[in-house]
Amino acid sequence: MKLMLGLLLLPLTLVHASPATPEPCELDQDEESVRCYCNFSDPQPNWSSAFLCAGAEDVEFYGGGRSLEYLLKRVDTEANLGQYTDIIRSLPLKRLTVRSARVPTQILFGTLRVLGYSGLRELTLENLEVTGTALSPLLDATGPDLNTLSLRNVSWATTDTWLAELQQWLKPGLKVLSIAQAHSLNFSCKQVGVFPALATLDLSDNPELGEKGLISALCPHKFPTLQVLALRNAGMETTSGVCSALAAARVPLQALDLSHNSLRDTAGTPSCDWPSQLNSLNLSFTGLEHVPKGLPAKLSVLDLSYNRLDRKPRPEELPEVGSLSLTGNPFLHSESQSEAYNSGVVIATALSPGSAGLSGTLALLLGHRLFV
């Protein structure tokens, strides 16, 4: 995007606004970092204001829903960056957020090429419409070495190949991938490459995904190091259906978040083999009336809070669970919440003050101490 390319000091001719146009970019500094926020929703914004962000570690651009297609005539996305690479490397940029714009694929991927020379570690794209088809990367092209990539309400013209195309512009060290409100998660698995370092995948807030969609999204053998999977509000209906999808994907999962799904009874369904290392499961806010059958054998952390349980789980139902959260279930109203559970299981009946605002993924990573 022109505003991003401008930030990275590319040799572009920027559109200059009149002197009366207010500056769209502002700096905010504290003891920890320098942040820069730019609002380019004005009909004729001063794009050159983006240079103000050159000294910031945390940068956010808001496009106001405008289309950036006109920039295709002004920006050479394949320009030689040789004399600018050292300048780009010197920028302190670590986190970048881009919101609300209509962006041609060539501009987006050209920007990722520029960011490949920066120290960017976290990228968030939100409320974007990515238009047009993608070109193959140049032989010497490489994208940023991201640790975290977050996509929310991003639509792509290439509905089933967008992940594979985006993946070509990222270095292979991505550890956390979040995709929310996606328009398509039906990936072309033959084209998707392996994510060799991905440890956390968050597909929450995709209510149309469902268990069949999960099978399509979790391309087999593409996530060999996946440890945490978050599926909050993702249209899941049964724990057995999720188990089948995980078995097909062959992921070494350790923590699974199924909270905020309407789960139903799976009694009588065929047994399923969960990932052998799965030991943490979040089933809060799922409407359960009793403990589901066929839970992971090595489950040690279980969140059943804010369901419809009318009794305590029996010890034989959860033989390996050492940390159990039951906050907000009906049976607690008729019992003393301080009553000891004679099986020795540690029961959490209230959330810690600091945990309420944490994401489900982070809560799972922290194990039994925090739950959403």
UniProtKB/Swiss-Prot annotation:
Disulfide bonds: C25-C38, C36-C53, C189-C219, C243-C272
Membrane topology recorded in Swiss-Prot or TrEMBL: Lipid-anchor; GPI-anchor
Induction notes from the record: Up-regulated in Kuppfer cells exposed to bacterial lipopolysaccharide (LPS).
LRR repeats by residue range: 57-84, 85-120, 121-146, 147-174, 175-198, 199-226, 227-253, 254-278, 279-299, 300-321, 322-346
Signal peptide annotation: 1-17
Key word Glycoprotein present: yes
Residues annotated as glycosylated: N39, N46, N153, N186, N282
Tissue/organ expression: Detected in macrophages and peripheral blood monocytes.
Entry-linked PROSITE patterns: LRR (PS51450)
GO molecular function list: lipopolysaccharide binding; lipopolysaccharide immune receptor activity; lipoteichoic acid binding
Keyword Oxidoreductase: no
Residues covered by region (Required for response to bacterial lipopolysaccharide (LPS)): 290-372
The entry's keywords: Cell membrane, Disulfide bond, Glycoprotein, Golgi apparatus, GPI-anchor, Immunity, Inflammatory response, Innate immunity, Leucine-rich repeat, Lipoprotein, Membrane, Repeat, Secreted, Signal
Chief place where the protein resides: membrane
Subcellular localization, as worded in the UniProt entry: Cell membrane; Secreted; Membrane raft; Golgi apparatus
Known role: Coreceptor for bacterial lipopolysaccharide. In concert with LBP, binds to monomeric lipopolysaccharide and delivers it to the LY96/TLR4 complex, thereby mediating the innate immune response to bacterial lipopolysaccharide (LPS). Acts via MyD88, TIRAP and TRAF6, leading to NF-kappa-B activation, cytokine secretion and the inflammatory response.
Subunit structure: Belongs to the lipopolysaccharide (LPS) receptor, a multi-protein complex containing at least CD14, LY96 and TLR4. Interacts with LPS-bound LPB. Interacts with LPAR1. Interacts with the TLR2:TLR6 or TLR2:TLR1 heterodimers; upon interaction with ligands such as diacylated lipopeptides and triacylated lipopeptides, respectively. Interacts with MYO18A. Interacts with FSTL1.
Name recorded for this polypeptide: Monocyte differentiation antigen CD14
Organism per entry: Rattus norvegicus
Gene name in the database record: Cd14
